[in-house]
Amino acid sequence: MLYLILNPMLKIQEVKAKSILNKSKIFDYCLNPYTGCEHNCAYCYARLFMRRYSGHSEPWGEFIDVKINAPELLRKQLERAKKGTVWISSVCDPYQPIESKYRLTRQCLEELGKKQFPVNIQTKSALVLRDLDLILQFEEREVGITIATDDESVAKLFEPRASTVKERLDALEKIHSKGIKTFAFIGPLLPGNPEKLVEQLEEKADRVYIDRMNYISTIRGFYYRYKLTGAATEKFFSEYKQRLVNELEKRQMRYEVLF
């Protein structure tokens, strides 16, 4: 069993949500068992609006609201919901460290499995392996892992509390080996070796999605602080994308560029 160590400085509070299965513009529904994300990724778009939305004064990455009634609420909503694909999750990582304690994502998967709602799971955590037994019970399921760079030091800088690159690659390989449809999300494009990254993804990901750094103006100071300003330019995104595409095509891997 994989247990993750929680950040002792994290402010955690248990709350009761009013809704857990919500309409999405990307999939039919999205499901977020938590408000806040301990991974604290420097580039996360959620930090732009979720602190204000949640009413927290703490910086993004330093608070989590645990929706303790999520499984019960989901069970009720599924009784009247039209079947559709559920994205887990849109504004938090469903397998962030606190999930090893509360198991809300697992309990929600149990409810979704009873109704056979298709699921699309996206994470940066190897903790997803804990729930392979449940995921395998879905007739329609897809699991994606975000791997924005092959460089462990860069990943640690931008995604300080997420699983290591190696842990994510190993998880993706194991999930794929079980016959589950998989994808790798290379986004946002971070410094690294694109050819090596694609090589590592071969025979692990059925499809690769590529996206650039969005909201660059809000994170420019972060790049400047760590002397990475050259990786925050249109030239970098364009050239890095092309190197990824060239290597993907060379290896005849399916991909989609999202910008």
Spans of features found by a protein language model:
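Active-site beta-loop-alpha junctions enriched in small/polar residues
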Residues: 91-93, 124-126, 146-150, 187-189, ...
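Conserved strand-turn element in the central/C-terminal portion of the radical SAM core barrel
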Residues: 159-161, 171-194
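A general structural detector for well-ordered alpha-helical segments in enzyme core domains, enriched
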Residues: 73-74, 104-108, 131, 164-172, ...
